[in-house]
UniProtKB/Swiss-Prot annotation:
Species name: Saccharomyces cerevisiae (strain ATCC 204508 / S288c)
UniProt-recorded name of the protein: Uncharacterized membrane protein YPL257W
InterPro entries associated with the record: DUF4668
Residues in the Extracellular compartment per record: 1-58, 141-147
Task performed by this protein: May be required for cell cycle progression.
Cytoplasmic topology ranges: 80-119, 169-193
Phylogenetic classification of the source organism: Eukaryota, Fungi, Dikarya, Ascomycota, Saccharomycotina
Composition bias type Basic and acidic residues, residue spans: 1-10
Transmembrane annotation, as ranges: 59-79, 120-140, 148-168
Keyword Cell cycle set for record: yes
Entry annotated with the keyword Transmembrane: yes
Keywords, ordered alphabetically: Cell cycle, Membrane, Transmembrane, Transmembrane helix
Amino acid sequence: MTAHANERISDVSPSARGSSSESKYDKLCRVLFFIAITKSSFTPEHILYKHSIFTDKPILADIVTFMYAAFVSIGWFLIWGERAYRTQEMGQPPMYSNINYHLLSFKKRHPKKFTCALWLVFFLAYTVLTVLIWLVQLIFRKGNVFQMLLQLIILDIAIALVNVAIAFTFEIYLSQKAAIEIRDEGLNNLDTA
């Protein structure tokens, strides 16, 4: 390679190059975490309904399964938050640009209502996701196999839809936050000039 080509390559910022600066280990860890959380939320944990500690004390089983569902839901929030943040850092445009424009105008008119509504959506999504995962964990306590499989499929579809809503909300949250910060920086630069 010539010196001119090396100079042109070094001028490209890491965000413009994409995720090439990310190590293979980081990618592998992220994929393994995604697989573990997906498995934990879409399939029941056998130990929670077969171990004698949980079969003898159903109240303990309910508490442990609810705590398990809460931690798995936190894992989903970590996945979608990190993915939205990484997308924003790479400089990719938001997927929902028209919706973001309307939300940005709403945020300009009512900033406190917008923030409150967004956090309410996060809380409701977390609550619904936790309850759905909890129901998946409790599904094998019933006897009818066909009914259990049908309920499992319905609950898995509901979990997937809630995850789409969470991903969408994180993207809106981060893109609106970035749009406001960029606009504020532009106004500050005009004031100093």
